[in-house]
Amino acid sequence: MTGGLIVAGLGLAAVGFGARYVLRNQALIKKGMEAIPVAGGAFSNYYRGGFDQKMSRAEAAKILGVAPSAKPAKIKEAHKKVMIVNHPDRGGSPYLAAKINEAKDLMESSKS
């Protein structure tokens, strides 16, 4: 019983000291929070948006992760890497696999 009261007292003391620290150093904390970049982070390099109705060469290049002017060998290698990760037989989405194949076909057909 007394052990629980001691733990509760220590917890309240810690909360009190923490609140006092925050109130006294509010300006420093605000300045530190402003220095942290909000935009960007881990997802800043990802394409925002869905698929277009008719796939463009630029969209196909983004799906495969290659430049729009990539050579056929680079396109084939990129397609293989992306399909290994997203193949429906290994738990990937059939829709994404179809889009990946469509991107490969578009990139290869517009090269020749």
UniProtKB/Swiss-Prot annotation:
This chain's protein is named Mitochondrial import inner membrane translocase subunit TIM14
Q: Which residues lie on this side of the membrane: Mitochondrial intermembrane?
A: 1-3
Domain of life the protein comes from: Eukaryota
Self-association state and partner proteins as the record states: Probable component of the PAM complex at least composed of a mitochondrial HSP70 protein, GrpE, tim-44, tim-16 and tim-14/dnj-21.
Q: Cite the entry's keywords alphabetically.
A: Chaperone, Membrane, Mitochondrion, Mitochondrion inner membrane, Protein transport, Translocation, Transmembrane, Transmembrane helix, Transport
PANTHER family hit by this protein: GEO10507P1-RELATED, PTHR12763
Q: Which gene encodes it?
A: dnj-21
Q: What does this protein do?
A: Probable component of the PAM complex, a complex required for the translocation of transit peptide-containing proteins from the inner membrane into the mitochondrial matrix in an ATP-dependent manner. May act as a co-chaperone that stimulate the ATP-dependent activity.
Mitochondrial matrix side stretches:
25-112
